[in-house]
């Protein structure tokens, strides 16, 4: 049975996507592609949305960084942005700002997940893998585990 709802125009569909959350230009173009006959149509809609301020790469980057910063490191967030077609020059400032809090964010994530320094090499490797898989650099992971050990030693003296 066919739906009685009218088909959304490309612009209407794009606005529906943007109302749900921010999108990169490339991501929105990919989502609109199945509904357009001509790629030039999509570009025209995206240009119009960008000119009117509905579509903004800077806002998209800020949104992703805000949503992901608590749980992920710079490398993982950067990879997500690149996979969505965000130009590298659009994310540089946001990721540089995020690097300044990388150690604190990794320590907080480690505290919530583990809370205790690793008891043996196997547990240390597990904690290391967890933080690395979240996109934190090996230097930051090493510092987090070293600080955890140091704090634990201080608490026991």
UniProtKB/Swiss-Prot annotation:
Which Pfam families does its entry note? RecX_HTH1 (PF21982), RecX_HTH2 (PF02631), RecX_HTH3 (PF21981)
Q: Which residues form a coiled coil?
A: none
Q: Does the keyword tRNA processing apply?
A: no
Domain of life from the UniProt record = Bacteria
Keyword set for this entry? Answer: Cytoplasm
Task: Note the InterPro entries from the entry.
Answer: RecX_HTH_1st, RecX_HTH_2nd, RecX_HTH_3rd, Regulatory_RecX, WH-like_DNA-bd_sf
Q: What do the Gene Ontology cellular component annotations say?
A: cytoplasm
What is any one GO biological process for this UniProt entry? regulation of DNA repair
Subcellular location(s) per record: Cytoplasm
Give the matching PANTHER family: REGULATORY PROTEIN RECX FAMILY PROTEIN (PTHR33602:SF1)
Any idea what job this protein has?
Answer: Modulates RecA activity.
Name the record gives this protein: Regulatory protein RecX
Source species of the chain: Leptothrix cholodnii (strain ATCC 51168 / LMG 8142 / SP-6) (Leptothrix discophora (strain SP-6))
Gene that produces this protein: recX
């Amino acid at each position: 049975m066919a739906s009685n709802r009218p088909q959304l125009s490309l612009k209407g569909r794009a606005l529906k996507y943007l109302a749900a959350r921010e999108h990169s230009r490339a991501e929105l173009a990919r989502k609109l592609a199945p509904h357009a006959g001509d790629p030039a149509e999509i570009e025209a809609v995206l240009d119009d949305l960008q000119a009117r301020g509905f579509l903004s790469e800077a806002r998209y980057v800020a949104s992703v960084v805000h949503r992901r910063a608590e749980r992920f490191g710079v490398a993982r967030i950067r990879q997500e942005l690149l996979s969505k077609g965000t130009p590298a020059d659009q994310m540089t400032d946001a990721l540089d700002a995020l690097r300044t809090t990388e150690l604190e964010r990794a320590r907080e994530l480690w505290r919530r997940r583990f809370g205790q320094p690793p008891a043996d090499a196997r547990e240390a490797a597990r904690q290391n893998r967890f933080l690395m898989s979240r996109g934190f650099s090996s230097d930051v992971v090493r510092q987090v585990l070293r600080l955890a050990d140091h704090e634990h030693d201080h608490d026991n003296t």
